[in-house]
């Protein structure tokens, strides 16, 4: 392939040729991050379902809590000092409730209703480099939620590392 031409096209945002190249990623992130990312068009999504997988639920607890942005409806700013014990205790309680329901014979598709947005989920995400480029341009920006931005940055770095496309 003509590497110079490919880099030129990417640099100048001539993305249509990248609609013919595909990539797939295995992603693990909290449910609340997954729900933001699933909205991107033209990317195939296959999430691992608790209906079929009996693994023990894992939960995301942030190291740093952020304050609410004063100048936007969404977003965050600054750091708030608060213990993560509440989130850890809630996750542990939800896990116990989930296991209790399963022990009662409740089907997994109903028992999972007690699991919180902080539960980790995994999915396989495939699409064209053009579609991933569009997702990264939107989700790597500084006004994106930090946890979502982290996933987008990791995908962007992996694409760069593989010299697929430089976003």
Regions found by a protein language model. Give the residues of each.
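Family-specific signature for flavin-dependent thymidylate synthase
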Residues: 1-165
């Amino acid at each position: 392939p003509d590497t110079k031409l490919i880099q030129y096209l990417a640099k100048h945002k001539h993305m249509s040729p990248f609609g013919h190249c595909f990539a797939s990623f295995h992603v693990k992130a909290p449910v609340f991050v997954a729900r933001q990312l699933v909205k991107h068009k033209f990317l195939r999504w296959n999430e691992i379902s608790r209906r079929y997988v009996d693994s023990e639920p894992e939960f995301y607890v942030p190291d740093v809590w952020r304050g609410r942005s004063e100048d936007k409806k969404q977003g965050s700013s600054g750091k708030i000092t608060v213990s993560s014990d509440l989130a850890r205790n809630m996750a542990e309680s939800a896990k116990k409730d989930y296991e209790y329901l399963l022990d009662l014979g409740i089907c997994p598709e109903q028992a999972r209703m007690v699991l919180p947005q902080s539960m980790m989920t995994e999915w396989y995400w495939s699409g064209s480099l053009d579609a991933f480029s569009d997702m990264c341009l939107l989700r790597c920006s500084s006004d994106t939620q930090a946890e979502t931005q982290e996933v987008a940055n990791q995908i962007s770095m992996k694409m760069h590392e593989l010299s697929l496309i430089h976003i």
